[in-house]
Amino acid sequence: MTVRRAAVADAGALARLRHALWPEGPVEHHRGELDRFFAGSQAAPVLVAEDRSGLVGFAELSIRPYAEGCETERVGFLEGWFVVPAARHCGVGRKLVAAAEAWARSVGCTEFASDAEADNESSAAAHRALGFEDVGLIRCFRKDL
């Protein structure tokens, strides 16, 4: 199993993985986002984990000026992280996050953060297993004007 930066040729398989993590809307929506990503500057990478069967996971990264519980103004952020069920508990997620942290360090970040839905206990457990600490739960609100 290898971890590498996603390439244009990965867009179809990566769109399906993104849809498994974020199922709202069709796979084509994710494909469109990826097409725009690959056509743009790619300031932050998408990492993919690949084995003989194809892509088995991904990690989408960014730099944020603020993240809950962080003290610096340039925080490496794990925007999305997914491993197919058949490849879980085999070190794939750990390798993706290690590569993500290495990238964040390489661009000058000294903190790395992530988030998850408040009721997603499996994600919370996975984050904790990789050394993340809980820094709080928030509720977000909106209304039409």
List the model feature ranges, each with a label:
Residues E79, V83, H89-A102, A125, ...:
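Conserved acetyl-CoA-binding loop-helix of GNAT-fold acetyltransferases
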Residues V48, G54-I63, F77, F82:
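Conserved beta-strand in the GNAT
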Residues A113-S123, R142:
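Conserved beta-strand-loop-alpha-helix junction that forms the acyl-donor binding cleft
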Residues T2-L14:
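A short beta-loop-alpha structural element at the N-terminal edge
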Residues V97, A104-A116:
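Conserved GNAT acetyl-CoA-binding A-motif
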Residues P26-L47:
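Active-site rim helix/loop that mediates acceptor-substrate recognition in acyltransferases
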Residues T72-P85, R139:
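Conserved acetyl-CoA binding element of GNAT-fold acetyltransferases
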Residues A15-H29, G69:
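Helix-loop element at the rim of GNAT/NAT acetyltransferase active sites that forms part
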